[in-house]
Amino acid sequence: MGRRDGTGGAGVKGGMGAAGGAGGNAYLFGSGGAGGQGGMGAAGADGVNPTPTGTADAGSTGTDQTLGGNAIGGNGGPGDAGDAMTSGGAGGSGGNAVSTVNGDAVGGEGGKGGEGAYGGAGGAGGSAASIGNAAIGGNGGAGGNAQAPGGVGGAGGEGGDAQVGTNSPSNAEAGNGGSGGNGFDSFASGGTGGAGGTGGAGGRGGLLIGDGGAGGAGGVGGTGGSGAPGGGGGAGGDGGAANTDSAGSSRKAFGGDGGVGGDGASALGTGGEGGIGGQGGNGGAGGLLIGNGGAGGVGGTAGAGGTGGSGGAGGAGGAGGGGTNSGPGAAFGGNGNTGGNGGNGGAPGALGGKGGSGGLIGRAGSDGGVGAGGAGGAGGAGGTGGEGGTGGDGKTTDGNPGMGGSPGSAGQPGQPG
């Protein structure tokens, strides 16, 4: 979970690997035992985005209106704004309008979603129905933008439906869907991997005659944690449906356009650095009279860098509403955004252990080699583009399908140690 101030948290460093056991010592004659290999360091924790702890109040609902003349539904109120740990409130729905004689009917607009840790959803537009004149559905409210690291944008509200009667000379125009809110960038990086454990020392050769045992290899460093992902964009609202009771040339039904999907956000935190390799154990000493010293253990390989956080996905475009005479316009998916950069590889491995001293007749053991550097972490994946909304069906002219959003770019790989 992220910190209470809404900043999210970098991953914590992994624990160090256990040291290898020492080799046994020979008594008067014989070779010393080899030291054990050091344990692997623990992986660093992944970076985390904050988790909202509450939601602000929703906006008020617009009032419905039914009149013999012009009828206009009330607009929905905007959702209250949240803060770094509180999501925005949902927008209120627009009021419905019904004209029972020869007036126009206009549905109320949906309220905008509040901005906050996560964006609030937009309110739906009010529906409109007129017996003898035009009917215009209310537009859906826009989703609120996210304002905390890794937060997701709110979904757009649906457009209101529209219906005109058989005796009406006017058109039915449904409301458009609201646009989705944008996601917010993430910043938390992955934690550093833990250091590998030290290799165990080789055992001493026999007091008089015997070779010293080889030192154990150092443990491998832990892998760095992944960066936190960027926030996704909210989906666009669907357009409302329009309908006329008969398909006369003077009466056309226009389905509402789907809303534009919100943009996904970038992951700016890097993957954590790989842990350093453990130091190789020292070789055991040879016997006092005859015996070679044990070789020092090789240093452990450094851990690989963590993967950069992935970019947030773009929100899907809303579907166009259907119409009995004419379809809607196009809906566009939101663009994906850029993935975070990969973390750097761990530092070169620790120094190898020292070779043991030789006996009166015998040579000293060779020193252990230096451990290899860790591999660079992979770049974070780019966010996927949102899908375009489908065109609504029309009995004479179908609506056009929307275009999909563009995918985000992948992050750059980290440097090797």
Regions found by a protein language model. Name each.
Residues M1-G417:
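Glycine-centric low-complexity repeats
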